[in-house]
């Protein structure tokens, strides 16, 4: 006891200050580590925000996972019940949860309260038998739900209520006997659902009188192949209509659409639905309703717009009605403001405005064939005047720029041709030619060098011959050659004498004794 009493006071003095802080950190880490999140369990493989815990015989989610993961894979385990405690940690950033190939038989309310931001949930290949109401109510942003390869035989109408962002729903490989029309009509319909896979169930018929209520963009994504349909001309007409409309749900699985033709209560024969002359179904006995997407029509503000019903059932026995974006019924011979419907199905909009844009549904009802068809047509309204003035302004700017460039080019060419200044060499040459011409005229009148001139003076002087004889000399000139200095004179060279001449030396060539030599 005394030893302990004496050693405890000396312990703080024996530990250095730096080591003391390190020791405190180690103690805190050891105390917190069992309950801390962010560690990777031994049964999982972690890669930053992706965790895979597949085939590890788990019955629930490990509690020490990193809370900011975005993808969690729990496939091939033995999870059997999804309750409020099966995920002990709140994963606020988890967007993909995969729990396929487990033993899930039931899902309780609040099972996904810790994963509110899930966008993709995979519960395929389990043992679910039904989908009850409020089962997925916490998943407000869920976009993809996979429930294929279960034992589901019942879907509550409110099972998917609240999933306003759900786009894809996989229910293939279950035991459904009815087509889930509640997904498209009614209180709990899913407006964004564009893909529904109910293939390979136990659905024997399609509600033809309600399928026409499904919008065209959703109807295109319904997959029905692999179901044991009962052979019926209306079903054949429906699938043929989809096939001609190039719906991928039919064109990609053409040979998987079959039906059973019952010969008696015990024997049946399986037939391909999409084949020519199926059961000799004629157009007069077809009974069904179809819905498809039509074209996009462009209308201009204030200009009359005519929209035709893009239907395939129109003939003399067909009645047409239109439904506007505001659910207003437009019928022939009824006053509906600036709308008018003709008996051939055409819709005329007088003086359309921006408020008239939207999706218009044309419903064609064939009395002879008992066939209804609904076509959705998108009408866009734009202001053509504004667009036209804008384009006209751009065209004017382009034309003006081109014209200005042409005028500038022409002016530059004219300046180059007529206002180009003469170079100095050209000016000197002109002056020299003028000087030579004047000297040529004067040289005819100047006397030749005297005989008594010195040799140096003779060398310095230059003889010049500039005479051009007339071809027809005039009579009375004593055979003399008439000089015409005003004609063209060729000056071979004019060099002034180094000796300056006085005025007395210049005499008229007529009185000069020096003979003239005419050049021919």
Swiss-Prot record:
Location of this chain's protein in the cell: Cell membrane; Nucleus
Superkingdom of the organism of origin: Eukaryota
Pfam families linked: ig, LRR_8
Ranges where the LRRNT domain occurs: 38-67
TM region positions: 399-419
One term under GO cellular component: plasma membrane
PANTHER family xref list: AMPHOTERIN-INDUCED PROTEIN, AMPHOTERIN-INDUCED PROTEIN 2
InterPro entries listed in its UniProt record: AMIGO, Ig-like_dom, Ig-like_dom_sf, Ig-like_fold, Ig_sub, Ig_sub2, Immunoglobulin_dom, Leu-rich_rpt
Protein name, as recorded: Amphoterin-induced protein 2
Positions annotated as glycosylated: 57, 103, 280, 287, 344, 372, 380, 383, 387
Name of the gene this protein is made from: Amigo2
Organism name: Rattus norvegicus (Rat)
Keyword Phosphoprotein: no
Lineage: Eukaryota, Metazoa, Chordata, Craniata, Vertebrata
Subunit composition and interactions: Binds itself as well as AMIGO1 and AMIGO3.
Ranges of residues in domain LRRCT: 227-283
Domain Ig-like C2-type positions: 288-378
Family the UniProt entry places it in: Belongs to the immunoglobulin superfamily. AMIGO family.
Keywords in alphabetical order: Cell adhesion, Cell membrane, Disulfide bond, Glycoprotein, Immunoglobulin domain, Leucine-rich repeat, Membrane, Nucleus, Repeat, Signal, Transmembrane, Transmembrane helix
Cystine residue pairs: 40-46, 44-53, 231-259, 233-281, 309-362
GO BP terms in the entry: brain development; cerebellum development; heterophilic cell-cell adhesion via plasma membrane cell adhesion molecules; homophilic cell adhesion via plasma membrane adhesion molecules; negative regulation of neuron apoptotic process; negative regulation of programmed cell death; positive regulation of synapse assembly
Expressing tissues: Highest levels in the lung. High levels in cerebellar granule neurons and Purkinje cells. Also in pyramidal cells between CA1 and CA3 regions of the hippocampus and granule cells of the dentate gyrus.
Signal peptide: 1-37
Region Disordered: start-end pairs: 437-458, 498-520
């Amino acid at each position: 006891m005394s030893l302990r009493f004496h050693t405890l006071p000396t312990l703080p003095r024996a530990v250095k200050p730096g080591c003391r802080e390190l020791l405190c950190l180690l103690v805190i880490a050891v105390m917190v580590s069992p309950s801390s999140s962010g560690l990777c369990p031994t049964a999982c493989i972690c890669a930053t925000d992706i965790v895979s815990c597949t085939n590890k015989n788990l019955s629930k989610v490990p509690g020490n996972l990193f809370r900011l993961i975005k993808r969690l894979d729990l496939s091939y385990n033995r999870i059997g019940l999804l309750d409020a405690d099966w995920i002990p940690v709140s994963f606020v950033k988890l967007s993909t949860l995969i729990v396929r190939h487990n033993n899930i038989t039931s899902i309780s309310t609040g099972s996904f309260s810790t994963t509110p931001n899930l966008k993709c949930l995979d519960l395929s290949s389990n043992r679910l038998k039904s989908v009850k109401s409020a089962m997925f109510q916490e998943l407000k942003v869920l976009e993809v739900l996979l429930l294929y390869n279960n034992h589901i035989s019942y879907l509550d109408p409110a099972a998917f209520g609240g999933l306003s962002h759900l786009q894809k729903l996989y229910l293939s490989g279950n035991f459904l006997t009815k087509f889930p029309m509640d997904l498209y009509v009614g209180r709990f319909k899913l407006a964004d659902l564009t893909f529904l896979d109910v293939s390979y169930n136990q659905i024997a018929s399609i509600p033809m009188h309600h399928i026409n209520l499904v919008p065209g963009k959703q109807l295109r994504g319904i997959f029905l192949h692999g179901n044991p349909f009962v052979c019926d001309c209306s079903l054949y007409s429906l699938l043929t209509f989809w096939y001609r409309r190039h719906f991928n749900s039919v064109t990609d699985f053409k040979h998987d659409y079959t039906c059973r033709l019952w010969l008696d209560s015990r024997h049946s024969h399986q037939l391909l639905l999409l084949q020519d002359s199926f059961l000799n179904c004629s157009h007069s006995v077809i009974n069904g309703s179809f819905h498809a997407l039509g074209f996009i029509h462009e209308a201009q503000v204030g200009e009359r717009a005519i929209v035709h019903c893009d239907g395939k059932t129109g003939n003399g026995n067909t009645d047409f009605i239109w439904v506007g974006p505001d659910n207003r019924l437009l019928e022939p011979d009824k006053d509906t403001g600036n709308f008018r419907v003709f008996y051939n199905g055409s819709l005329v909009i007088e003086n359309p405005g921006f408020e008239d844009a939207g999706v218009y549904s044309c419903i064609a009802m064939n009395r002879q064939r008992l066939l209804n068809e609904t076509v959705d047509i998108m009408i866009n309204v734009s202001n053509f005047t504004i667009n036209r003035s804008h384009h006209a302004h751009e065209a004017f700017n382009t034309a003006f720029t081109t014209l200005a460039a042409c005028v500038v080019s022409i002016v530059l060419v004219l300046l180059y041709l007529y206002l180009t200044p003469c170079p100095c060499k050209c000016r000197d040459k002109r002056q020299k030619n003028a000087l030579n011409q004047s000297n040529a005229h004067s040289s005819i009148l100047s006397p030749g060098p005297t005989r008594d001139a010195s040799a140096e003076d003779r060398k310095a002087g230059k003889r010049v011959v500039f005479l051009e004889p007339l071809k027809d000399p005039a009579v009375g000139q004593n055979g003399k050659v008439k000089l015409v200095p005003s004609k063209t004179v060729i000056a071979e060279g004019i060099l002034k004498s180094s000796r300056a001449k006085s005025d007395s030396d210049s005499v008229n060539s007529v009185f000069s004794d020096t003979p003239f030599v005419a050049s021919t």
